[in-house]
Amino acid sequence: MLVRGHHSGKIFPGRRTGSIPGRPILPDAGVSLLELILVLSLFGTLTAIALALVLQSYKGVQLRLSTSTLFDSGTMALNQMTKELRMAGYPSAKAFTSSAVTSYPGLVATPFITVTAYDVVFQSATHQDGIVEQIEYVLAPGSQNLYRYSTHKNLNGSLQASTVQTLLLNNVQNRIIGTPLFTWNTNPSDTQSFPLNVQSVYINMVLQSTSNESGSPASVTLTATCPRINF
């Protein structure tokens, strides 16, 4: 008789019968932690670089704004000084009769009374209204403030008692660094003594702002040539 064998339903140890459904396959925990550290480190580095660039850009903008403000205020003062210095000695005695000059010496403006590296005194009818003023631009020793003093001249040639003081500009560094604010040249053919023979005044204004948010002070140098128009 032929007898057929039957397999039992047992699973023998050591034999693979396939994966068990529903159980996830986890990656190596050590590799994942290393990758996370590298990503965080890279992110931190990029963030630091980005912040540094933003800060540098901000400082650059602040420096440009400070420089622009310094330039604008300096240019305004320089334009006024240039206009008035060009009119030094206006009107001269040539504009009047000799008898008028003798009777009213205050009609005539003396071109330059004092001319030094940091102090210029002159007379002019700057408003062209016939009223002569004695004007002084002075940068005092150790000071960064440039002042303008103005005193009206009486018809008899004397000066009025009241003087108007105006702060033209601060942060002027010429005294601090030893650079002359004013230089000049004279007319060699003029027989008058100095400073009456001064023909032109040159302004060299060095400005520097105080520290700002940029961390660096703004610096500007402005120059002008002021020839006397009625020389």
What kind of feature is each model-predicted range?
Residues 109-189:
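Type IV pilin-like appendage domain
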Residues 192, 197-225:
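Short, conserved structural patches
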Residues 31-92:
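Aliphatic-rich helix starts adjacent to a transmembrane/signal segment
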Residues 1-31:
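N-terminal leader/signal peptides at the extreme start of proteins
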